[in-house]
Amino acid sequence: MDRRSLRGYPLIFSYLGLFSMLIGIILLIPLIMVVFYPHEINQVQYFLPPAFVLILFGFISKILYAKYDKERLERHQDAILVVLLWILAIFGAAIPFILTGEFNLSQAVFESSSGFSTTGLTVVDVTRASRVFLFYRSVLQFVGGAGLVLVLTATISDKFGMRMYNAEGHGDKLMPNLIRSGRYILAIYLGYVIVGTILYIIFGMHWFDALNHAICAVATGGFSTKAQSIGYYQSLPIEITTIFLMFAGGTNFFVHLLVITGKWKSALKHIETKSFYIITALAVSISTLSLISYYHGSFGTALRYGAFHFISAVTGTGYQIIPSFTGLPSFYFGLLIVGMILGAGVGSTCGGIKQYRVGLGIKSIYWSFADKIAHHKVIKKHFINKLGSKMIVDDDDISENYSFILVYLIFLMIGALIFSLVSQASMQNALFEFASVLGTVGLSVGITGYDAHPIILWTSSVGMFLGRLEFYVFFVAISKLFIDSKRSIKHLLQKA
């Protein structure tokens, strides 16, 4: 590449070295469980070697490119860095699964992608897995829920951090400095995990199960230590606790901060807070009505199962309290698909289109009709309430919003068609499964799993990756690489 194109790439490699060391450290965290379960000391062999290699690789890379630390990233190179960070994390975290000899590359990458993207679909038999590996899966969801870039910059450096954080799919920031923002987010995050763990223990969970379920509920990840998920416990208090944690994880972290600082009105007026709670309330009511006859006229049972699973779907958590989704009324089944597509809050741990975009879409439709029937053709300024302050919305904002929704739905249909074609599943089931993949949810009708075709697994891994990064980051990164490569080739040809 020519000098102009090359500028910033050495800094990317320097950051990758730093991040490689961080991934190596993450691989060591699950070994804490060996202290509590000494008989699982043999699990060390699956984590220590790859952790050492990743840390060593990162250290060498950091030394080689240390002199470039004062360089600046060029425009859109932050997107390239974020994409490469995620790819490094996914493949690095897949190594322990491969070393067990029980998983091939497709399965290991699928599990790692599901962890970091906080999806919760799995190829692991949790009834046979060691506690070290079960905790490892939860650690992946904890880190992925907070955001890989956030964890990196909050613990190490803020240089270019905010640009990367926004590129990772987070639309808001708590404070101008990402280190402070990151530490506040992690404090809120950890606070909910601690509260959730304590409540689960009080209501009868073993401490290990309580810790894992609390982590994965707040991360809206959905990995469980039980094959039956939350349904294993058949406990209403545990289900209510899970709903509370799912809501917490699905809410924008900035909204949490507004509530904590006493700014309740600002939190409630926020556009996606209204959208999220109004849509959820309506959907839960409709879900309950649609399930009453299915549960033989029991309103309480219909409310319990209808509310839990819709909230699990819309927050992108994926926990369930029934053995299977097959046989459910088709209307409710479709409602769950809609919930998975919509998603919850921007700046939360969930996936999907996100409630900010849903709210803006609904508002823009209203504005369009209102402008058309207005008596006088006047140009009106449109506003939305965003995190306690009014924000002007122009045509570009509306166009960009609809563009994202359209791209999301196109990818959803492509993925569903691939699932249906390869697995021979009905289009309804394929749409459900890929909506779960793309929305990083984790609810499943059985298309994904240990015995799934490699095409299904790789399509899922790509879908989870794109769903977590929200498409545009990936497109921008690929475009930037293509443009720089083209410019470099042209430069070389001119020299020749």
Give, region by region, the residue ranges found by the protein language model.
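Membrane-proximal intracellular helices of multi-pass ion channels
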Residues: M1-A496
